[in-house]
């Protein structure tokens, strides 16, 4: 058996699979519910533009998850562990932490032994406090395009490089006392190994520091973040990067063997970022298929053999296959924005369960209610500062009449508020995805398939609109779809143990029984429907330009 872990914003999840890559067990720790003493809301604390999480909460979650895992499966049969962490977030391990990891005692908790040697908080991917640092990072390298060409992305507020620079400015003494700066992925791997684990080849691409094609940290960027002549010191704090995503880093630490019953031969395989792990959960055909992860954020993922960068999207090294890449579009306002619309609709109709999606879905699926596309409406809903497009926070509603685009207010007679917000937000979100992924496809005008994972993949109305707007069949994992990231991590572990002589794609296809693994949940629409949505794309671009002009936020 193989274990995949996913240390995400709101939960730590674990998925156990067998040699045939079938899911056997799923366990989870919900931070707000199971570790309520930390008083997080959706896994984080907020202070203006700052969004961060308590690192000790993650340590407690590891212990609790393994307690639950031990009670549900024979963990001694787990041959290898891999997985993922939320991308970009940094963990500052202070001097003495390596020694403490080496000597963990199974009679005490992880938190009790490591708390004093870790900076208390880690910035979350939703953090938007590094505008100044992003501008400085782009300036030192020649602009957003130059930085994207080098590192795969323009400077982003959540990326680790800008976050480290801000941390050094705000906490100079702690920075100097830092022994290791880890990403969540190799922090979790370090805990499991009880020694410092290297950074992962794919996850390191989310730092704005890594020269992807030459596979090394760029000294100019290190100098900008660490200060003049301090680049080598920062490189030492970051440590090495493991190029081989299937590398056996070593056996699991004695703490986990004694406390939970893991085999001392259980291997730890490099953990990667949550998005790179997610693409490993499905056999995506490069340039043909799209994976939509519908979680707190919305991410569109594609595999590709071509290194073609743009400030409009992210390019990462593939987590397993060398000389292959992963393209990612990331939207901060995913499920949280849709939930706000849902809540407003539920309040209008006095729905007792405010978490119910029934009224929201009816507003989209009811044949007597015209969808936003039919009424030629667009809605941009950004309760948080958005990444794509760089705008917000704010809400913008638009109506299309002939060749003209008009900004409208929710109280105008032409807009049935809040019911029509449901179609507007779902259709506009997917129109933006369509607009940005089409140039990345190889030899086809629209995707062959879209795979959906994450919580909203179970929502019929949302999936229906994805199919209509993107113009293709929509598929979902039969098992583990809500935990696709952890599933991908488990498959990564299985490949590391059993995939010798095969590429990752060959290994997965060898074990992949499509009839058992995935299900077709929505058929592609008519060509006419797809074309009608295509006519809205120029108006969406205009709407986003208007929102950018009206927003004073530079992202």
From Swiss-Prot:
Binding positions (ATP): 357, 455-456, 459
EC supergroup of this enzyme: transferase
Gene responsible for this protein: xks1
Alphabetical keyword list: ATP-binding, Carbohydrate metabolism, Cytoplasm, Kinase, Nucleotide-binding, Transferase, Xylose metabolism
Record localization: Cytoplasm
GO molecular function: ATP binding; D-xylulokinase activity
Cellular compartments per GO CC: cytosol; nucleus
Name of this chain's protein: Xylulose kinase
EC number: 2.7.1.17
Cited InterPro entries: ATPase_NBD, D-XK_euk, FGGY_C, FGGY_N
């Amino acid at each position: 058996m193989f274990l995949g872990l996913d240390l995400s914003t709101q939960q730590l999840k674990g998925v156990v699979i067998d040699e045939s890559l079938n899911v056997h067990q799923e366990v989870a720790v919900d931070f707000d519910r199971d570790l309520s003493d930390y008083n997080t809301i959706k896994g984080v604390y907020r202070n203006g533009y700052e969004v961060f999480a308590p690192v000790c909460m993650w340590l407690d979650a590891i212990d609790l998850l393994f307690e639950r895992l031990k009670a549900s499966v024979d963990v001694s049969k787990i041959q290898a562990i891999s997985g993922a962490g939320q991308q970009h977030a940094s963990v500052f391990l202070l001097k003495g932490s390596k020694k403490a990891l080496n000597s963990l005692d199974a009679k005490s908790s992880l938190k009790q032994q490591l708390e004093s040697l870790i900076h208390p908080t880690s910035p979350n991917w939703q953090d938007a406090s590094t505008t100044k640092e992003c501008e400085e990072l782009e300036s030192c390298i020649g602009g957003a395009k130059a930085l994207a060409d080098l590192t795969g992305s323009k400077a982003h507020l959540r990326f680790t490089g800008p976050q480290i620079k801000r941390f050094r400015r705000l906490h100079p003494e702690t920075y100097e006392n830092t022994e290791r700066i880890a990403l969540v992925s190799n922090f979790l791997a370090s805990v499991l190994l009880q020694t410092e684990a290297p950074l992962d080849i794919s996850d390191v691409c989310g730092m704005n520091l890594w020269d992807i094609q030459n596979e090394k940290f760029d000294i100019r960027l290190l100098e900008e973040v660490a200060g003049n002549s301090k680049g080598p010191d920062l490189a030492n704090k970051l440590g090495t990067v493991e190029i081989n995503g299937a590398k056996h880093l070593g056996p699991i630490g004695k703490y986990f063997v004694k406390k939970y019953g893991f085999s001392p031969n259980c291997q730890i395989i490099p953990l990667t970022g949550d998005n790179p792990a997610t693409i490993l959960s499905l056999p995506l055909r490069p340039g043909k298929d799209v994976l939509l992860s519908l979680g707190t954020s919305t991410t569109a993922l594609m595999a590709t053999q071509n290194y073609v960068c743009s400030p409009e999207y992210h390019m990462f090294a593939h987590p397993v296959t060398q000389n292959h890449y992963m393209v990612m579009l990331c939207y901060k306002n995913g499920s949280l924005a849709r939930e706000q619309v849902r809540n407003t609709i539920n309040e209008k109709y006095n729905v007792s369960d405010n978490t119910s999606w029934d009224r929201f879905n009816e507003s989209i699926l009811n044949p007597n209610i015209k969808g936003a596309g039919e009424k030629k409406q667009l809605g941009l809903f950004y309760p948080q500062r958005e990444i794509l497009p760089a705008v917000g926070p704010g809400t913008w509603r638009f109506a299309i009449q002939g060749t003209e685009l008009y900004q409208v207010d929710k109280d105008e007679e032409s807009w049935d508020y809040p019911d029509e917000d449901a179609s507007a937000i779902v259709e506009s979100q997917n129109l933006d995805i369509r607009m940005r992924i089409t140039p990345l496809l190889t030899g086809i005008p629209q995707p062959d398939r879209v795979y959906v994972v994450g919580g909203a993949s179970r929502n019929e109305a949302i999936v229906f609109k994805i199919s209509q707007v993107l113009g293709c069949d929509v598929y979902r994992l039969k098992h583990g779809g809500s935990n696709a990231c952890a599933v991908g991590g488990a498959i990564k572990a299985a490949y590391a143990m059993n995939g010798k002589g095969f590429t990752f794609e060959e290994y997965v296809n060898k074990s992949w029984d499509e009839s058992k693994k995935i299900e077709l949940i929505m058929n592609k629409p008519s060509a006419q429907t797809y074309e009608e949505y295509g006519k809205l794309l120029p108006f969406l671009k205009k709407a986003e330009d208007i929102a950018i002009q009206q927003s004073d936020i530079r992202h």
